[in-house]
Amino acid sequence: GLWKNMLSGIGKLAGEAALGAVKTLV
């Protein structure tokens, strides 16, 4: 449970960071 929550949180942050990077590039 704890690991799943941590991984999903990290994935969310990574996804948002990737979207932000793409927006700044475009």
UniProtKB/Swiss-Prot annotation:
Belongs to the frog skin active peptide (FSAP) family. Dermaseptin subfamily. The modification Valine amide is found at residue 26. Transmembrane segments: none annotated. GO terms for cellular component: extracellular region. InterPro entries: Dermaseptin_dom. It comes from Phasmahyla jandaia. It holds the Pfam family DD_K. GO terms for biological process: defense response to bacterium. This is Dermaseptin-J2. The keyword Heme does not apply. Its main location: secreted. Has antimicrobial activity. It comes from the Eukaryota. It is found in: Secreted. Expressed by the skin glands. Signal peptide: none annotated. Keywords: Amidation, Amphibian defense peptide, Antibiotic, Antimicrobial, Secreted.
